[in-house]
Amino acid sequence: MLTSKEIRESFKTFFASKGHKIVPSAPMVIKGDPTLMFTNAGMNQFKDIILGNTEAKYTRVADSQKCLRVSGKHNDLEEVGHDTYHHTMFEMLGNWSFGDYFKKEAIEWAWEYLVTVLGLDPQRLYATVFEGNPEEGLDRDNEAASYWAQFLPEERIINGNKHDNFWEMGDTGPCGPCSEIHIDLRSDEERAQINGLELINKSHPQVIEIWNLVFMQYNRKADASLTPLPHKVIDTGMGFERLCMALQGKTSNYDTDVFQPLIRTLATMTGIGYGEDSTSDIAMRVVADHIRTIAFAITDGQLPSNAKAGYVIRRILRRAVRYGYTFLHCREAFMYRLLPTLIDTMGDAYPELQAQRELISRVIKEEEESFLRTLETGIRLLEKKIADNKATGSTVLDGVAAFELYDTFGFPLDLTALILSENGMTVDESGFDTEMQKQKERARNAAAVEAGDWVVLREGESKFSGYDFTETETEILRYRQVKQKNKEYFQVVLSDTPFYAEMGGQVGDSGQLIDESGVAYDIFDTKRENNLSVHLMKKLPESTTDTFVARINQDKRRQAEANHTATHLLHEALREVLGTHVEQKGSFVSPEVLRFDFSHFGKMSPEEIRKVEELVSERIRADFQREEFRDVPIAEAQAMGAMALFGEKYGEEVRVLKYGSSVELCGGTHIPSTGMIGAFRIVTESSIASGVRRIEAVTGIGAERFIYEKEDILLAVKELFNNNPNLIKSIKKMLEEDASLKKQIADMKHERMLKFKKSLLEQDVRRRGIRLFLFQEIMEAETAKDIAFQIAGELQESFVLIAGTTEGGEKCALTVMLSKDLTEGGMDAAKLVRSAAKHIQGGGGGQPHFATAGGKNPKGLPAAIQQILTEAELTD
């Protein structure tokens, strides 16, 4: 039986023998494509080639691509763990042809690999072909069917509709018919009873698609019409985990050697055997799947967070923790302990897992611990809602409350339903679904982008000349109109542009496009989309066919360049001061500020921050000249000392920037010499995730302003101390005096409180046999609370304390304390306070024995106190 490692290598070996260039997997986290957060198919890294924006370096390519599908069209998240073949992170084996071979070779080689090389039973294989679509004038794909007829009988070549057998990149763009290969893994007895033909595309767990061959031959325009592609593309994708299942004779992907090591480790950790119970089995599958996704995302530079791609990763991690908490009884962080097993399983194919081991482990552990605390808070909130419902006789938790638990505390509906069922209650699922739909609609509206078709004025590739020039003569190659969030603008592609498109953390250039008559049109930003430099303009030139001058805003560019070069010097200084474990984890470079994220497991000391600043400043004063090396082979660049960053996609040739001993792989723009940075100051140093720190810094004019602001503060403080030459001594003396005075005040307050409490205890006011303490005073609410708890600790009889306090001005408070016997009898301080708070224009709450309310209408205190007395039946 082939192992998963052997299967992966056999695929690469086979297609290498067919003249394919074997390329490494692209990062799972996508940069430079606004339509995608994650790589969800093998074709993503070749999208710019398929769109015609970049010329293919190789016409035949194959790889094993790590993918993630959790959102949008490919939303598999809720299926994961509940069936045998859905995953969040999976590997896609694929082969591509860019204008080389087409359907014949794609089909013949797929069959040869599956049957001849791997030895799959041909009697278990089926192929689907596109049946055609008369509405769009598309005929049946008889060409593909004829090639399949070489290997399969006619009855196992199945017509498929547009939904299943016509692949589209999106609403617009390259598309075409596809041919899926399905395999029937059922036993001979089952196959004899029901023909596999009846189960194709019917979600049967053992009659599954394993390979999709896409024949891209059309381009879908914005008006939905189709035009032929000038260069046809083959794009195939085969689910690696499903292939392993078929070859290893399993009935579930999770029973293969891809997942079983993780599941066995999990069983050992929890003491729960896999196969003992369906709910714990689902939980184990969820955890085994999700730990892979989370680890690879962190490896590729995407940390869990509350925004965009980071939020998706956090959701996946929390889903795994919830399943572990609910069904595997994991009350402490546990997922990070699976990392050694994952590395043993996949570390050979993806060595970055081992290289980033400590960071991945720390990030996951901290995220788990944080969410477990949140989970406990959510459970307490749900318990309160259950108690409130029981008090009113309701047995149904409303959908809004259930959705709040989901949205705020990460409670899935099934966990809420489980806890409710244990308390004889149910949840309003319809109301929950309504709230979920509202949220999805809000998200869709916020992210909706409508892009028209490209208006192509001239054919040709766009050239970037911004490393050498700040203005160039150019022409418009193409443009299109875009609508987003009720705003309209144009995307413009130029034949030759000095504008740097936002990439690698550096913001895009702004500037002007100047026509032949001298009229300037603003370019407010430049973005990178599918390997195109796209210039954003609110208004198009009147004549788009003119020759133009493209001119960047040089001041902003130069400031951004200074900040970008400073990040290189900062990176080197951090590694010198903190150690070589420091690696860049992200950056942001604008004309105003630079932000640098790096791996490090502790807060930097003031001395370390000062040392880093000094090292960067030394290199600025040294005025190192920029040494630039373009089109350097990646291995040669690394031999020069440049470090490749995890999560970045590099070509075979790269650009190297050198300033003194600082050597970096970088595609950004940089100043000619370090002296032009002028000055460098670190503004903040903070944590953004476990094991990842962030420095924000300023350079040049920004650094000068930062220093001036500090000086202004210092001068203002000196002035407050009458320009005393020994300012630190004066401040220390003031703090000592302040502490002494505060202690005297606290002692006086305490003494006053004791006297006031004594006077209360000397009174003996009783109503219905209950001792009543009633007062309205100018006093802090905290003092009233102290009095209440001291009296409660000293008395052994029934009592009620009601206090109305003001601190001067409009602030006021109500305080109510009840003895234990009264709360056991049904009296509730929180309800009394909430009811009376309206008189003081405030609100409050608490527990049955003690509650407070704050308000802004002291004149209402007498009425509030009277209402409490009335409701407690303690009036005269």
Curated annotation (Swiss-Prot):
Enzyme class (EC, first level): ligase
Localization annotation: Cytoplasm
SUPFAM superfamilies on file: Class II aaRS and biotin synthetases, Putative anticodon-binding domain of alanyl-tRNA synthetase (AlaRS), ThrRS/AlaRS common domain, Translation proteins
CDD domains: AlaRS_core
Cofactor or coenzyme needed: Zn(2+)
BP GO terms, sorted: alanyl-tRNA aminoacylation
Domain of life the protein comes from: Bacteria
Cofactor: how bound: Binds 1 zinc ion per subunit.
EC number: 6.1.1.7
Annotated function: Catalyzes the attachment of alanine to tRNA(Ala) in a two-step reaction: alanine is first activated by ATP to form Ala-AMP and then transferred to the acceptor end of tRNA(Ala). Also edits incorrectly charged Ser-tRNA(Ala) and Gly-tRNA(Ala) via its editing domain.
Protein name: Alanine--tRNA ligase
Species name: Porphyromonas gingivalis (strain ATCC BAA-308 / W83)
Lineage: Bacteria, Pseudomonadati, Bacteroidota, Bacteroidia, Bacteroidales
